[in-house]
């Protein structure tokens, strides 16, 4: 007998990177990751594959399936395949989206239900245990799974606030990759008192100011160019940041700012692509699309 499950989760952009203080904020973006799980009776383990990235690291998605099976005391073997619109290792929460989609697809395969935050926490645990994240990225995982803007305390694994927002999002995704687990935590911790100030702004709902302050702080600490942020400010954008630990930049923009900022970023000369999307407010459970894995 074969048990099959499909799910989708969304990417996210950074408002406050939690590495410095363990407190973060993020927003969902309308870029999707799909997961397809097939399970059978047996004990030979879980084998994962990432569509379009044959050499990709599959430990996270495999471990997500394993944790769900362990949670319900099931001994099954099988496969998990993921496919994504989110650039890998670009600071756009590809790992959080993959973990969320993998956990949800496995739950659907075995016919079980868990509360949304418990699903998120299983994915965060998997990410920590395989070492793809520094803080567990609970903020990113919440934004990916729940949609909207979220503010979190990652150490306590607590969702402090969530609200929906309507905005276009412009992302510059350089061709080079930067894996979160490789980031310079020591330098990030030096800026903690100032990141705390940005977090206070986010708690007050001043997300764009919080995001921009976060961006300048982390660009300085991690050695990324601030030119992309300054170009956005020149275009009248008020919310722009390095996303995650880079190398992507994300800006919350009005429809009339899209064209100008796109051309400003393209003129900066770094190899990469500009992605136009919007804030996603839908949660992963209610979204039934399967997209690229159909």
Swiss-Prot record:
InterPro entries: GHMP_kinase_C_dom, GHMP_kinase_C_sf, GHMP_kinase_N_dom, Ribosomal_Su5_D2-typ_SF, Ribsml_uS5_D2-typ_fold_subgr, SK_arc. Pfam families: GHMP_kinases_C, GHMP_kinases_N. The keyword Transport does not apply. It catalyses: shikimate + ATP = 3-phosphoshikimate + ADP + H(+). Pathway: Metabolic intermediate biosynthesis; chorismate biosynthesis; chorismate from D-erythrose 4-phosphate and phosphoenolpyruvate: step 5/7. Coiled coil: none annotated. It is an enzyme of class 2 (transferase). One of its GO terms (molecular function) is shikimate kinase activity. Gene3D superfamilies: 3.30.230.10. The keyword Transferase applies. One of its GO terms (biological process) is chorismate biosynthetic process. It is found in: Cytoplasm. Keywords: Amino-acid biosynthesis, Aromatic amino acid biosynthesis, ATP-binding, Cytoplasm, Kinase, Nucleotide-binding, Transferase. Its EC number is 2.7.1.71. ATP binds at residues 87-97. GO terms for cellular component: cytoplasm. Belongs to the GHMP kinase family. Archaeal shikimate kinase subfamily. This is Shikimate kinase.
């Amino acid at each position: 007998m074969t048990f099959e499950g499909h799910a989708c989760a969304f990417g996210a952009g950074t408002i406050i990177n939690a590495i410095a203080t363990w407190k973060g904020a993020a927003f969902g973006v309308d870029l999707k990751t799909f997961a397809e799980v097939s399970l059978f009776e047996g004990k030979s383990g879980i084998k994962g594959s990432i569509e379009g990235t044959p050499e990709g690291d599959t430990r996270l998605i495999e471990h997500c399936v394993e944790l769900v099976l362990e949670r319900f005391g099931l001994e099954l073997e099988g496969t998990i395949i993921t496919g994504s619109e989110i650039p890998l290792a670009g600071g756009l929460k590809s790992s959080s989206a993959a973990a969320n989609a993998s956990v949800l697809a496995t739950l659907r395969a075995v016919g079980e239900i868990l509360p949304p935050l418990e699903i998120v926490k299983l994915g965060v645990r998997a990410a920590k245990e395989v070492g793809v994240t520094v803080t567990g990225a609970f903020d990113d995982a919440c934004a990916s799974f729940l949609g909207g803007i979220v503010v979190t305390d990652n150490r306590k694994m607590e969702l402090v606030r969530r609200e929906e927002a309507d905005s276009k999002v412009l992302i510059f995704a350089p061709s080079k990759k930067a894996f979160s687990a490789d980031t310079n935590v020591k330098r990030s911790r030096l800026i903690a008192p100032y990141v705390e100030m940005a977090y206070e702004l986010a708690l007050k709902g001043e997300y764009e100011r919080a995001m921009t302050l976060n961006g300048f702080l982390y660009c300085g600490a991690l050695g990324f160019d601030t030119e992309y942020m300054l170009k956005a400010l020149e275009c009248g954008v008020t919310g722009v940041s390095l996303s995650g630990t880079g190398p992507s930049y994300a800006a919350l923009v009005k429809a009339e700012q899209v064209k100008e900022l796109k051309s400003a970023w393209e003129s900066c000369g770094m190899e990469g692509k500009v992605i136009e999307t919007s804030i996603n407010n839908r949660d992963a459970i209610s979204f039934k699309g399967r997209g690229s894995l159909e």
